[in-house]
């Protein structure tokens, strides 16, 4: 890879990462893979390289992914009409077959292949495997009343044993966001990948949850680009949730869920930037928006970092 940095500047970059390498050695990092990083070939490659780098320097990355654009493309190719209610896709049994096929048979396989080009590290699985996730069917309130949107659910419980076994074996789990229905294990639900990643991060005792998106982070006054929030306490974020726009709200709700579940830090970062995960984890400035427990935020502020 070509770079204009001098040798001494390259050394400075590596040295800047040293305290973070020491802090995060042996820690689990759950990464929600989504947005443009899933559809741009160069960004896909960068993401895979980031996961390999994390593993090789002693961290334990765990990936959770959705696949909205790929699902929409396949439904269109198969002539299956997508209906939306209140901005949410209605998932019929026919559409659910496509969701399952695309997530576990296409998106997962592609990412596993990109990672494993660097060595036999990644293992694909879904929320169905090993009883990882259990979900409850969602009935969102639209126009003031509960609405049936089909086979869509929320993760309500996690058995992370299968993921723990893979991590202990030095593997990188790549988890597709589908899960059996808690009320009928033969029925599979499409679950929100942000929320699933948050639930898994809490279950495995992750040090960080990192969510990739297509904006720089959370803005206090969107679309004012100067209002980007670098750090925020979980209670302030909780107060903001009702007023957030529909695309950002589930991501910030996932951050709140992770912090409430004991994860020390949750981040929303711009996945359109190559190697954004490494920039967040291994640089002093970081990028995007970091969510922390209020007491953790106060402690960082008192120490000036």
Curated annotation (Swiss-Prot):
Gene3D superfamilies: Acetylglutamate kinase-like. This is Acetylglutamate kinase. SUPFAM superfamilies: Carbamate kinase-like (SSF53633). InterPro entries: AceGlu_kinase-like_sf, AcgluKinase_fam, ArgB, Asp/Glu/Uridylate_kinase, Glu/AcGlu_kinase, NAGK-C. Keywords: Amino-acid biosynthesis, Arginine biosynthesis, ATP-binding, Cytoplasm, Kinase, Nucleotide-binding, Transferase. Catalyzes the ATP-dependent phosphorylation of N-acetyl-L-glutamate. The record marks 32, 251 as: Transition state stabilizer. CDD domains: AAK_NAGK-C. The gene is argB. Substrate binds at residues 67-68, 89, 190. It comes from Bifidobacterium longum (strain NCC 2705).
């Amino acid at each position: 890879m070509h770079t204009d940095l001098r040798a001494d500047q390259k050394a400075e970059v590596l040295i800047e990462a040293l305290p973070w390498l020491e802090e995060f050695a042996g820690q689990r990092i759950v990464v929600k893979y989504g947005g443009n990083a899933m559809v741009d070939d160069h960004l896909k490659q960068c993401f895979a390289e980031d996961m390999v780098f994390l593993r090789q320097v002693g961290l334990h990355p765990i990936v959770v992914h959705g696949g909205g654009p790929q699902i929409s493309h396949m439904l269109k190719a198969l002539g299956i009409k997508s209906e939306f209610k209140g901005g949410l896709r209605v998932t019929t049994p026919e559409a659910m077959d496509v969701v399952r096929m695309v997530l576990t048979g296409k998106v997962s396989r592609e990412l596993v292949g990109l990672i494993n080009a660097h060595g036999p590290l990644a293992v694909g699985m879904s929320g169905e495997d090993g009883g990882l996730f259990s979900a409850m069917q969602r009935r969102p309130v639209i126009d003031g009343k509960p609405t049936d949107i089909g086979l869509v659910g929320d993760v309500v419980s996690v058995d992370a044993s299968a993921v723990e076994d893979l991590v202990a074996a030095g593997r990188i789990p790549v988890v597709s966001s589908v899960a059996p229905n808690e009320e009928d294990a033969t029925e599979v639900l499409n679950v929100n990948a942000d929320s699933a990643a948050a639930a898994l991060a809490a279950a495995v005792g992750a040090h960080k949850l990192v969510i990739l998106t297509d904006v720089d982070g959370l803005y206090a006054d969107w679309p004012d680009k100067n209002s980007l929030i670098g750090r925020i306490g979980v209670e302030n974020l909780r107060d903001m949730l009702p007023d957030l726009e529909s695309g950002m709200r589930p991501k910030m709700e996932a951050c709140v869920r992770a912090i409430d579940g004991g994860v020390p830090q949750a981040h929303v970062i711009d996945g359109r930037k190559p190697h954004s995960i490494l920039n967040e984890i291994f640089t002093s400035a970081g990028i995007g928006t970091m969510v922390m427990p209020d007491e953790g935020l106060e402690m960082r502020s008192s120490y000036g970092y």
